[in-house]
Each structure stands twice: as C-alpha cells, then as structure tokens.
Amino acid sequence: MKFGKFSFRRKITSYTKVQSIVSDFIRCKPVFIKRKRIQGLTLLNVGCGPFPNKSFINLDYCWTPEIDICWDITRKPYPIESASLEGIYTEHCLEHIGFNDFENNMREFFRLLKPGGTVRIIMPDGEIYLDIYQRKKNGEQVLMPHEETYLTPMARINGIFRNHGHRFIYDFDTVKKLLEKAGFKDIKKESYLQGRDKFLLIDTESRAIESLYVEASK
C-alpha cells in the first residue's frame, strides 16, 4: 500500500491511509474503547467525524486519535450500559445507514438513555429540497442549498439522495414515526442551536441551511 508523500512534520496517525488501517483493525473491538477518558461522561456523539467534543463520548466508524469508540452501528449494539446517558447527539450521520438500521438505532438510543434523557438528530431535510423543487416548477426564483454546482434542479435532488454515501433521506414525519415506534415521546422539530438541552447544542453552522433538527425524550 502506498502512503503518498511523507513528511516528518506530520504525525503518522494524521494520514488517512493509516487511519483507515487502524479503523479496520480496532472497529467493534471493546478492548480499544477509551474507557478511562469516557468514564463518567453521560453525553454521546454518534458519527462525530472530524469534530469530536471533549464533553461527549465520541463514536465514529472511522478512527482518528480523538475517537473514543470506533464502531459500526449497523453491526453490533452500542458498547454502552443501558440507561446511562443524559443525551445523544448525531449530526449528518444516520442518512448514511439503511432505513432498517436507522430504526434499530432508534431502539438503541432509547435503551441507552436515562428516563427523561434527550436525543437530538440532525440530518439533511428531504422536505426542504422537494418543497423548493415544486416551487421552482411553479415559477418561483428560488434555489436549493448548494444547487449552483448541479446541472439542473433534478440533478440536485438526486445529489442529496445518492451522493456522499447517503442511503435514505428523511423528513420530520418519517423520523417522528420511527422515534414513536422506539418508545420516545415529546418529539419536536427544532432549529439550528435551538433545543431543550443546552449541552446538545453543538450544531455546525454551515449545515443549517439544509438540515432537519429533531429532538425527543425518553
């Protein structure tokens, strides 16, 4: 395997190929969980990617040095004790897994949360794109998020549904029904940096224009 140009100024763990090798080796192996660092933490960030937060247990499919748990959330239950979390946060992650896996994860979230705990789910909002598409067909001069890089509005629709490894794009009604099915209550559509638990408001500003924000309680 070629690693490309090497620099002594970079840590070896900063190379994408190194991270990929480590990910494949440690993924879903509890022995590699950073249990000492996450001891006592009651907030979970699912799919944190390159934006881990020290106040959270940071879980991702791809390993980097800051990841606490390298895990495939479509293969095994979360390696976290039931009813041990105050909050769960996930931003632009769950659209990358299949519909059935999403449903399974809602049940897992319910298991992990303490009574009264909150889940905050952020993902691309299919309704935003479809609504703007119809408005454009009706003659309005409006643009979908990031539409300028696509050939036509329909190409943009396909982009949000198919690009970047997306498996399923949701609207509020679909997420609400799946949360209800898992046992959640008080399910509400929120907005950027608005929600019931201030500790879960770590949203990425650049994603606000296209995102669906949903919160629910156990």
Annotate each PLM feature:
Residues 36-37, 50, 206:
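Short, flexible hinge/linker loops that cap or flank conserved catalytic cores
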Residues 1-40:
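Membrane-proximal basic amphipathic "stem/tether" segments
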